[in-house]
């Protein structure tokens, strides 16, 4: 079976997957796996082409905060894998909580397998470099305005060759960008933005996101970042590889979401420690909200000739710690060494840019019940917020709602295209809200925004009624 994922093929991929296939055979699973890597920046375009042309493959990765599985379902691209999960998914059902697995269903049928690798209530925090705060005699910011003024001071005093810009792949979706950090400071919180276009609060109110006061506040904050020189001037054309390179080089001060490791920090500050990256929440006393029940998963394309084999492979990964370690960390003694029950030490290869020759992806098919941590190199506060369940967190009432745009197919396609051209530059702060938004909104209305929002509201109200809300 062929498993398609975003990313770059590790140097020792073939060696590791030979071992994986040998173990699959020894365990009698009856599956042989080939993993196909597509560069991240070409992912959407290439995957959509593969799906539309019916190319032969059997499993592909889903990023819910980028393109949710419902989007593929609505194109008729996903296979119903309910039967395969019931028959071959015992380990999946055992290790993925019911409320998360329920988020992978449409009309009671399974169309994806969630990756239970992260606590989704982590959405809304950001990382800050405490070593840089200390070097500049600064306190940790507690408001968006304090964040900007702190960042300005750091930028002015920065001695590195590359400035610690705000860098990301441009969008207008606060969940994808993690600009949801701002939302905790608004009186209307808790709310989330679902499927890029729809504001949903815990009372069940649905609005057009770009027409809310909250969108305007976000855009005005981003405009300040941009005009004060804190945002990368090339923000609208940045590629994911460029964003990653900045983090890997240690040339950053603030990252929305979680990032960093000791080795990357020390490229910028050789004296840095793992405690020099802190997790910050604005208004930490407020509720912690999961916008989605899961962030990543894997789905079987409708044209797959091996749907059961795909489920068997995912189930096998969670059959033992040995299987999981092989898939995620590679060959023990060559790519990593165990460090206690849940620890591991990466073996960096000087002939591979001082990185291990193999590393899997726990965002693609990881599970918190099996994950190992680099106890010397990983960031303790990030580990806690990402990989420990938050017992006080609540799910957004829209977390498991799936929108079907069939009735507004043309309008939905049009607003997606128009928003990329007209809304993203405003949300990223490159254009001024008061000056440019009226014309952009007019274009969105002409593209069919009102009709799409009305259909979303109708379906969400029906969903709420079925939930007994």
Question: What is each of the regions a protein language model found here?
Answer:
Residues 1-469:
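Extracytoplasmic/secretory soluble proteins
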